[in-house]
């Protein structure tokens, strides 16, 4: 796999950090999840392909263990607020002194500087501060968060993964690691570059929910069907819009011009009335295989079984028959081979990991006696 041999230490956190670590593991990296003592499980359920080490970082011997491991690692991924790692004497200056090749990835909400750098937040707060949340929502309604995907996973976990890969690539030239300041506010803002760049064109000149690409246009929104389901319409280009009208049984002559913004509300009512006359399945029979840019709004379960997704193998199942998306993108020579095993229990690989990182049997036994580590396999390995 593409990242075979890359050693990653991921400090336990929520959502974006685990997602970043999972991507790296899916593509072949050796990811060790450094869990807190006493943890019961992994709340983000994104520990696929990782090994778990339970370690008390709040005590100096535990911090010393991590420091020693970082001397042999390629990447450290930490998800804490600004300053936390420095308090533990595990800041980048300290760890990179031992290992100049170490890539120190810092994934936070607000970044390592600025007035918000040490305050708490969640996805909705990061999307709000990026400016993007102001653009999401229906006309006349409050802005609403797009699940917790945009900041946590797009602007956070995925952008941090990109930073790590860039740093790994650059290291092949310089032989040196570097510090990555990945944060969800700036990551989300970067994802919205198109929005910023097209403001001068007037693409977002109307109030929220009344523009071309935010549900304001009658040909770029969703419609309810006769059976209470929904269809998604994205017929922007004139040739696609013509096919949309054909499928709906409408003539362009009986409607205002496609780009007549002032007529969009009435056109939406007209389209809604037509869509409400047939079921989702009936509309699929009409539009599937056409260039009208009309698709069904699928539930997760429906997406799993949709013919297109099944033909491509877009979803996989683990040994417990739980389904999830296959890693993307697909690489032709070195594709991802995600683990089909269950997520590790906390501390399941503590002894194994420490041995791999050069700790002796006696050292491991002492760490356990001092309650610096936990392992549910300790007795079997000592």
From Swiss-Prot:
Subcellular location: Peroxisome; Mitochondrion
Lineage top rank: taxon: Eukaryota
Record's keyword terms, sorted: Acetylation, Isomerase, Mitochondrion, Peroxisome
Segments carrying motif Microbody targeting signal: 380-382
The keyword Mitochondrion is assigned to this record: yes
Residue positions, PTM N6-succinyllysine: 87, 101, 268
Keyword Endoplasmic reticulum carried by entry: no
UniProt-recorded name of the protein: Alpha-methylacyl-CoA racemase
Organism for this UniProt entry: Rattus norvegicus
Chain segments annotated as transmembrane: none
Enzyme class, spelled out: isomerase
Residue ranges that the Swiss-Prot or TrEMBL entry lists as coiled coil: none
Active site residues of this protein: 122, 152
Location of region: Disordered: 319-347
UniProt pathway: Lipid metabolism; bile acid biosynthesis; Lipid metabolism; fatty acid metabolism
Family matches, as Gene3D superfamilies: Crotonobetainyl-coa:carnitine coa-transferase, domain 1 (3.40.50.10540), formyl-coa transferase, domain 3 (3.30.1540.10)
InterPro entries, alphabetized: CoA-transferase_III, CoA-Trfase_fam_III, CoA-Trfase_III_dom3_sf, CoA-Trfase_III_dom_1_sf
